[in-house]
Amino acid sequence: MSELFSNDNIFLNVNVNSQNEAIEKAGKALVDSGAVTDAYIQAMKDREQVVSTFMGNGLAIPHGTDEAKTNVIHSGLTLLQIPEGVDWDGEVVKVVVGIAGKDGEHLDLLSKIAITFSEEENVDRIVQAKSAEEIKQVFEEADA
């Protein structure tokens, strides 16, 4: 899974003022990497209106609606490390993983991310990481 995380799509020490701003940043990174079209960002916001993508342990995993599958060019991930946290429907989120999955691949990605974040130690390591490589290593170890 770490192969879907390029160093260019891992953003350290991000400051955002709102959940909406965090979704926009994650979505823009997916657009910039060529994984999705611009329309996918709105689909990420639309999904959030229907159901929160907060997963617990300081993690949110915004992704597009099922109808937005046509806006996915190839699978991709982006990660925002937000050490100060951002309010996410009353919860504090310190890591946002934006997800775009092609051909149903997002379900596998969601599962692997949830497993990684089920360990509090992994969450702490990601929030405190000083480099993209450190973050990728946490996922590689969890995926082993």
From Swiss-Prot:
GO terms for biological process: phosphoenolpyruvate-dependent sugar phosphotransferase system. Transmembrane segments: none annotated. The keyword Phosphoprotein applies. Keywords: Cytoplasm, Kinase, Phosphoprotein, Phosphotransferase system, Sugar transport, Transferase, Transport. The active site is at H63 (tele-phosphohistidine intermediate). One of its GO terms (cellular component) is plasma membrane. InterPro entries: PTrfase/Anion_transptr, PTS_EIIA_type-2_dom, Sugar_PTS. Homodimer or homotrimer. Seems to be a monomer when not phosphorylated. The phosphoenolpyruvate-dependent sugar phosphotransferase system (sugar PTS), a major carbohydrate active transport system, catalyzes the phosphorylation of incoming sugar substrates concomitantly with their translocation across the cell membrane. The enzyme II CmtAB PTS system is involved in D-mannitol transport. The PTS EIIA type-2 domain is phosphorylated by phospho-HPr on a histidyl residue. Then, it transfers the phosphoryl group to the PTS EIIB type-2 domain. This is Mannitol-specific phosphotransferase enzyme IIA component. The gene is mtlF.
